[in-house]
Amino acid sequence: SPAFIIAEIGNNHQGSVAFAKDLVDLAVESGADAVKFQLRDMDALYRQRGAATAGEDLGVQYTLDLLSRFSLSVDQMYEVFDHVKQHNMDIMCTPWDAPSVQALVDYGIQGMKIASADLTNHELLRDVASRGLPMLVSTGMSREEEIRESVALLRNAGASYALLQCQSAYPAPFKDVNLAYMDRLAEIGQCLVGYSGHERGYHVPIAAVARGAKIIEKHFTTDKTLEGNDHTVSLLPEEFKAMVQQIREVEAAIGSAAPREVSTGELMNRVNLAKSLVATRHIAKGEVVTEADVAVKSPGRGLQPNHLPQLVGRTMQRDVEEGSFFFEGDLKDDLGTRRDFKFDRPWGLPVRYHDYKPLIEEAKPDFLEFHFSY
């Protein structure tokens, strides 16, 4: 199945419902399968508000300032969700606290994501798991024992979940991304795995899909210079669209581990470039073929060279002219019964210029289709 691609709008709407709706529209045009937002109840989430933040680290103060200005209220978020529904697009949201979980459940959200920062927040994990909704769980800034603890909690709760490999640095250095860890995550979680990216560009998510990621999440913006933590690691609409297209191309290219078949394109090149077994002299019906009677020459319209041992020593069931191809029928004891096809309407065949003359002498079609080139 194709990877599920999420446009993470988060708080990149800058606290504007209108801007959030515009981002949704652009995400739809860019080919995203879902959009995702974040919902916080600031009173429930942070231990200090307002002037009390003076005692906090400057990074925390900056984050609180951004969130106070750029967060949407529950009612505003519902309005944006309604807009998403008009596009028949999936909606996901990250709740950062218990009141936000309840607000999302009250709306009828389709799925929730646990942020990397909350992987060890077992109370929140239990709350979301108890709601019976699909869960995505990011594993950034976590130790493996913490991941295992949270996975055990989710499994005991009977949750439906997937794990996302994530490097929670903005931007994430490529050397720290570690896509190979997805294999270990799949083993730990016994679940689908994906990738939530904070690196610049979009080639890493494409590589993640090639490595087996079934979920991709990338931040989405219209301007990487806007104020906020996520804009610099976000993709512009045209970048996101290119990522989606290239992911789909890679998925098509991955194919399967089924026994190899010759593709339609290869069949033509097999004829043009491969070699065949060809008669070096006129061989009459009833004669035995010797190795001296056979040469290997292009093109590959006849019996492949690896059939030479099977051909040598056989008695020919037909006349073969010098320079003519041997065919698979020459390896059989009889040529089979020729069938006389009749059609109750005009019929034709797609042909190449170099082989249409003998064909029309034998088959007598009503029309031929030629492919033209320069």
Residue ranges: model-predicted function:
Residues S1-Y374:
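Catalytic cores and adjacent flexible loops of soluble metabolic enzymes
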